[in-house]
Amino acid sequence: MNPVDYLRISLIDRCNFRCHYCVPDEASLQYLLTSEQLSNGEILTLLEQVFIPLGFRKFRLTGGEPLLRPQLVPLVRAIAHLPGVEDLSMTTNAYLLADLAQDLYNAGLNRLNISLDSLNPETFDQIIGNRGKSRWQQTWEGIQAAHRVGFDPLKLNVVVIPGVNDQEVLDLAALTGDRHWHVRFIEFMPIGNDKLFNERAWIPSEELRQRIRAKWGLETAFVQGNGPADIFKIPGAKGTLGFISQMSECFCDRCNRMRLSADGWLRPCLLNEAAQMDLKTLLRTGVPPREIRAAVKALLDQKPEINFKMRDMGTTTGQYGRTMSQIGG
């Protein structure tokens, strides 16, 4: 297994979209109160006194939608300036990004991943559950703003859902032709969305690659921070294509990350919520950071076994108790 040096930090469980694969229609969510979320100070304490001393060097801010987090820019600036932080990135839906892109860039945010599941405004609005208001144009303006201020690499994440947006794979791949953009196709997976998954299932990454290969050809490539993605490019294109194949091609041996939820639960494996640790309660009950660090180190030492032997036993009930929006993706 790779060294675990990457922490995904959910800043908030709320989102201004309600994407069907992330927050299913039937989901009844109880959002966290502000007091139930980790504060900026608590996040910084955990990074500075627990995770960085344990070798974590790369951090990604997620949600929900992280741009909804109050005092976001000062938090980004504080994390970016912590000794030991080598890379700070964010995943966002870009709806509020146009007005924040420059400030985030100036604060020290290195990279952005942006969810863009369709280039068709009607399909896009259907996927995000727009509730009567079209949001495609403002999202696209956010992506353009991120490009203008200099975020590089700029990655676009596409969750491919059969019969919904899979017919756009070639159009989305074409975005990489004349831009230094990196489009990543993600296999749809069943976490908190069993009904939609059972209705739609998923398309293997290799099938998507075959479609692209048949039109333009494909060659292997590299991009910074590729994580579990397999990277290719269309010959002559400026950008790249990534394929995240968590359903068809197990990549547990390449896993280098843990996840911290907005309410302080540390999750060593996306597919396993039975092995979580409540760091917020430890902090708020006065447990010294050195003891929290020792507990996290013990969980870190168990991660290979959790990944390989327990990924199919990731819940105690057979169903995940949290949606992707609550986990932080």
From Swiss-Prot:
It is an enzyme of class 4 (lyase). Binds 2 [4Fe-4S] clusters. Binds 1 [4Fe-4S] cluster coordinated with 3 cysteines and an exchangeable S-adenosyl-L-methionine and 1 [4Fe-4S] cluster coordinated with 3 cysteines and the GTP-derived substrate. Pathway: Cofactor biosynthesis; molybdopterin biosynthesis. Its EC number is 4.1.99.22. It catalyses: GTP + AH2 + S-adenosyl-L-methionine = (8S)-3',8-cyclo-7,8-dihydroguanosine 5'-triphosphate + 5'-deoxyadenosine + L-methionine + A + H(+). One of its GO terms (biological process) is Mo-molybdopterin cofactor biosynthetic process. Keywords: 4Fe-4S, GTP-binding, Iron, Iron-sulfur, Lyase, Metal-binding, Molybdenum cofactor biosynthesis, Nucleotide-binding, S-adenosyl-L-methionine. [4Fe-4S] cluster 1 binds at C15, C19, C22. InterPro entries: Aldolase_TIM, Elp3/MiaA/NifB-like_rSAM, MoaA, MoaA_NifB_PqqE_Fe-S-bd_CS, MoaA_twitch, MoCo_biosynth_MoaA/MoaC, rSAM. Belongs to the radical SAM superfamily. MoaA family. Catalyzes the cyclization of GTP to (8S)-3',8-cyclo-7,8-dihydroguanosine 5'-triphosphate. HAMAP family: MoaA_B. Monomer and homodimer. NCBIfam families: moaA (TIGR02666). PANTHER family: MOLYBDENUM COFACTOR BIOSYNTHESIS PROTEIN 1 (PTHR22960:SF0), MOLYBDOPTERIN COFACTOR SYNTHESIS PROTEIN A (PTHR22960). This is GTP 3',8-cyclase. It comes from Picosynechococcus sp. (strain ATCC 27264 / PCC 7002 / PR-6). The lineage of its organism: Bacteria, Bacillati, Cyanobacteriota, Cyanophyceae, Oscillatoriophycideae.
